[in-house]
Amino acid sequence: MRMELIENLLQLLVTFVGALLSGISYRKSGRHAYFLLLCFYGCFALGALYWTLYLLLFDTTPRVFYVSEFGWVASVIFLRILQATLASQDERSFRCRRAWLAPAFGVPLLAFYCTFGDILSNLIWCGMMIWLSFCAIRGLVYANGQTGAARNMRCFHIGVLCFAGSEYLLWTAGCFWPDTSPASPTFWCDMLLTLAILGLLPATRKAVDA
C-alpha cells in the first residue's frame, strides 16, 4: 500500500506541474490549446488527488472509485477536444485505413476487460481510447506525408498513442496482477502511464508551433 501511495503522489505531482506549466503557457501565448491541456492535467490531478487522499486517510483504495473516474474521464474528453483543435481540416477529412487498427485492437480488449470489471465503465474507457487512438493514427499518417513545421504534429500524435497504449497496458496488467508492489508489472505500467502523461506537455508545445 505504501508503494501505491508513493506512485499516486508522483502522478499527482506530475499532473499538478503539467497543469501549472500549461496555465503559464496559456497566459503568455493566449493559445486555446494550452487551456485545453490545462483542463486535461487539472481534471486528471483532481482524480488523482481524491485517490491519494483516500490512501493517506484510510490506508486502502477507495471503495467508491467513481469519484476519481469522473475526473479522469473528463481529462480524456479534454484531451480529445485538444486533439480535434490541433488537427487541420485536411487532417480531419484524411482517410486512412491504418486508423482502423485502433478498433481492431481495442474492441477485443473491451470484451476481455468486461469479464473482469464494470461493463459501463469499460465501455466508456475503451470507447474513448479507441476514438483517441483512431484519430492519433490517422493524424500520424497524415503528418508523415507533410513537410516543414506541419510534421511537428507527429510528436503530439505519438504522445496520444503512448498515453492510450499505457492505459491499455495498465488495465491488462491489473487484470492479472492486482498487486501494486514494485515486483508487480502493474506498478511499472502505472509509472509508464505517468511518463506518458508528462510527455504530452512538450508534445503539445511542438504541435502548437506546427
Where are these regions (language model features)?
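Hydrophobic transmembrane alpha-helical segments in integral membrane proteins
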Residues: 1-17, 116-126
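Hydrophobic alpha-helical transmembrane segments of multi-pass membrane proteins
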Residues: 10-21, 33-57, 68-76, 156-176, ...
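Hydrophobic alpha-helical transmembrane segments
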Residues: 22-26, 109-118, 141, 174
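Membrane-interface helix caps and helix-loop-helix hairpins in membrane proteins
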Residues: 56-63, 112-123, 176-180
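C-terminal transmembrane-bundle signature of multipass membrane proteins
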Residues: 134-210
